From Swiss-Prot:
GO terms for cellular component: cytoplasm. The gene is dnaJ. InterPro entries: DnaJ (IPR012724), DnaJ_C (IPR002939), DnaJ_domain (IPR001623), DnaJ_domain_CS (IPR018253), HSP40/DnaJ_pept-bd (IPR008971), HSP_DnaJ_Cys-rich_dom (IPR001305), HSP_DnaJ_Cys-rich_dom_sf (IPR036410), J_dom_sf (IPR036869). Participates actively in the response to hyperosmotic and heat shock by preventing the aggregation of stress-denatured proteins and by disaggregating proteins, also in an autonomous, DnaK-independent fashion. Unfolded proteins bind initially to DnaJ; upon interaction with the DnaJ-bound protein, DnaK hydrolyzes its bound ATP, resulting in the formation of a stable complex. GrpE releases ADP from DnaK; ATP binding to DnaK triggers the release of the substrate protein, thus completing the reaction cycle. Belongs to the DnaJ family. A zinc finger (CR-type) spans 131-209. This is Chaperone protein DnaJ. Its cofactor is Zn(2+). The J domain is necessary and sufficient to stimulate DnaK ATPase activity. Zinc center 1 plays an important role in the autonomous, DnaK-independent chaperone activity of DnaJ. Zinc center 2 is essential for interaction with DnaK and for DnaJ activity.
Length: 376
């Protein structure tokens, strides 16, 4: 039976770097791993092919031999006893790729995931209601573009730690007990960098500022948080990057107040309009609209304008605009206006105007009863 090309098995090109090969291998190994495909002989065979291709293409000597001679380079024991004739060594996979997910690892400490970042973004009410796209600039740690996160000088590879032999742990004996501890030489990574990258000095990451375009959905409010996956700090030595969280803060608006998906505003009217009624213009986020004010309107009355509020970022009906009327006392009156008001007051039957002011009548009736009770 003709064996499939190792590069085709992993789905990479013949010029692929080791980093690309490892990435492809991890993805395929996770898919075809026997623990995920119990009893599936085809998946087990596919997994062995993937592991075989990975072991050859990540070993510089074996890869060079394969590139020159193909599969013939490893026939009849050509791999020096390391071949693939026997069953696949799943414990290596557990340790290198899946760590403690399947519980069979060798204890190697995986490189740390990058830290999450937070960015506080101030928005106007209009931006929060309608949605907006904003560019932000953040300082972060990015993967070194020279060593691609390995920390090693280009052309070199991290070396297996001589203390723990790549396991990331050492065994300490205390009497009858053996205790495993993180290797102090490599800090649990299992490898050491002999020739560090000149740009990142072996860290695999460099400090840099980057600009991102952030799309803010319509309807967000103060306290909402937007997650940008993978836009946090780069992970150590090729580990996954962290996330960026954009925290929303909506600035105070000069006219509107927001409560949930509803907007509130105060609308001043003069007392003649309040008494007689009429039509006024009120502001909305979409422009001015007409509002009919009925006669005998009192301060504090709310008028609801449906659908003129905020559309929820989580879906559902749009909120309303509630206009709270404030009846203003006139100021700066001329003599003619004062005279007319005096005549109006007299027509009410005195300062209280009980017949035309139901709240005043109720108030003064209560005051009268209070003093009557005191004198009994």
């Amino acid at each position: 039976m003709v064996k499939q090309d190792y590069y085709e098995i992993l789905g990479v090109s013949k010029t692929a770097e080791e980093r690309e090969i490892r990435k492809a291998y991890k993805r395929l190994a996770m898919k075809y791993h026997p623990d995920r495909n119990q009893g599936d002989k085809e998946a087990e065979a596919k997994f062995k092919e993937i592991k075989e291709a990975y072991e050859v293409l990540t070993d510089s000597q074996k890869r060079a031999a394969y590139d020159q001679y193909g599969h013939a380079a490893f026939e009849q024991g050509g791999m020096g006893g390391g071949g693939f004739g026997g069953g696949a060594d799943f414990s290596d996979i557990f340790g290198d790729v899946f760590g403690d997910i399947f519980g069979g690892g060798r204890g190697r400490q995986r490189a740390a995931r990058g830290a999450d970042l937070r960015y506080n973004m101030e928005l106007t009410l209009e931006e929060a209601v309608r949605g907006v796209t904003k560019e932000i600039r953040i300082p972060t740690l990015e993967e070194c573009d020279v060593c691609h996160g390995s920390g090693a000088k280009p052309g070199t590879q991290p070396q297996t730690c001589p203390t723990c032999h790549g396991s990331g742990q050492v065994q300490m004996r205390q009497g009858f007990f053996a205790v495993q501890q993180t290797c102090p030489h490599c800090q649990g990574r299992g490898t050491l960098i002999k020739d560090p990258c000149n740009k990142c000095h072996g860290h695999g990451r460099v400090e840099r500022s980057k600009t991102l375009s952030v799309k803010i959905p319509a309807g967000v409010d103060t306290g909402d948080r937007i997650r940008l996956a993978g836009e946090g700090e780069a992970g150590e030595h090729g580990a996954p990057a962290g996330d960026l969280y954009v925290q929303v803060q909506v600035k105070q608006h000069p006219i509107f107040e927001r409560e949930g998906n509803n907007l509130y505003c105060e609308v001043p009217i003069n007392f003649a309009m309040a008494a007689l009624g009429g039509e006024i213009e009120v502001p909305t986020l979409d422009g001015r609209v007409k509002l009919k004010v009925p006669g005998e309107t009192q301060t504090g009355k709310l008028f609801r304008m449906r659908g003129k509020g905020v559309k929820s970022v989580r879906g559902g009906a749009q909120g309303d605009l509630l206009c709270r009327v404030v009846v203003e006392t006139p100021v700066g009156l001329n003599e003619r206006q004062k005279q007319l008001l005096q005549e109006l007051q007299e027509s009410f039957g005195g300062p209280t105007g009980e017949h035309n002011s139901p709240r005043s009548k109720s108030f003064f009736d209560g005051v009268k009863k209070f003093f009557d009770d005191l004198t009994r």
